[in-house]
Amino acid sequence: MEPSGSKKGRAEEPREEVECQMSSQPSTSSAKTKATGKKQRKSEKDDGCKPEEKSAQDPETPGHARRKVPVPPFPQHLPPVNLIHRDVLRAWCQEMKLSSKGQKLDAYKRLLARAFPDQMPELKNVPDSAKEARLKMPRKKMKTEPGEESQVTVPLEIVTVPEEQIPALVDPPVLYEEVSTTVVTTSASEAVLASWARIAANAKKLEAVPSNATSETYGSTGEMWCVVHGTSLPATSSGWVRLQFHAGQAWVPDKKGKAIALFLLPACTFPPPHLEDNMLCPKCVHKNKILTKSLEG
């Protein structure tokens, strides 16, 4: 027979093992409570139950109140519908004991027929749509963003002034008088350059001239006047030519009935009465040929 102490020890061992297993496993009661909490939240969402929000506004920040339009006294002549505010039109209808219900156009027509029968011919000028009957506001600023403003402009009506009211200009302004009396003067050298500028435009142009254009002429005194040098030179040397003028330009006669444009600037001096003033010396003829070749090359 086994002693009683050993039996008690064996009985206590399985109890300790069961307690250890129970402590290692999670408690089902806590899991149940968590599951029930989730179900409650889902049921609140399904039912649309939300926490109460403060519907009342803060007393320090009052709500936006509608601006009250001042009602003017009843007029003797009814203005157009687009110049009357809706609230003003309703107040006038109530003053005349008329119905102010419906659209703005309907109330305007009722008031026009009841209180202003003399203006009934103007009924054809009343707009047909409610959009055209809206109140026309003057220029105002609409705030789009903080710090930025956008302006709404109303087109201005252009009024023509009768011709009788336009003042006539009797005396011209001082500025016009100064401009009209201004005279531009140029020196003699600038005038010569301007006159010969057209010749330079036809640098490569050759023109046919009569054969008798290249005739040498000797003065009775043995001197000839060169237009480029601006002085009289001995006429004994050969090669003097007479300048030909055609189409407002001076030409130097050349061989075979041709002519070359004159590029040398003439002197601003006049010859004596007994000398011809359209002759060119041989040196100037040679210089003009060289200048023409350089321009062509």
UniProtKB/Swiss-Prot annotation:
Modified residues (Phosphoserine): S211
UniProt feature, compositional bias: Basic and acidic residues: 43-63
GO terms (BP aspect): lung-associated mesenchyme development; system development
Pfam families reported in the protein's UniProt record: DCR, Dppa2_A
Major location (coarse): nucleus
InterPro entries per record: Dppa2/4, Dppa2/4_C_dom, Dppa2/4_central_dom
Compartment(s) of residence: Nucleus
Low complexity composition-biased segments: 23-34
Domain of life: Eukaryota
Alphabetical UniProt keywords: Developmental protein, Nucleus, Phosphoprotein, Transcription, Transcription regulation
A GO CC term assigned to this protein in UniProt: nucleus
Protein function: May be involved in the maintenance of active epigenetic status of target genes. May inhibit differentiation of embryonic stem (ES) cells into a primitive ectoderm lineage.
Protein name per the record: Developmental pluripotency-associated protein 4
Organism: Rattus norvegicus (Rat)
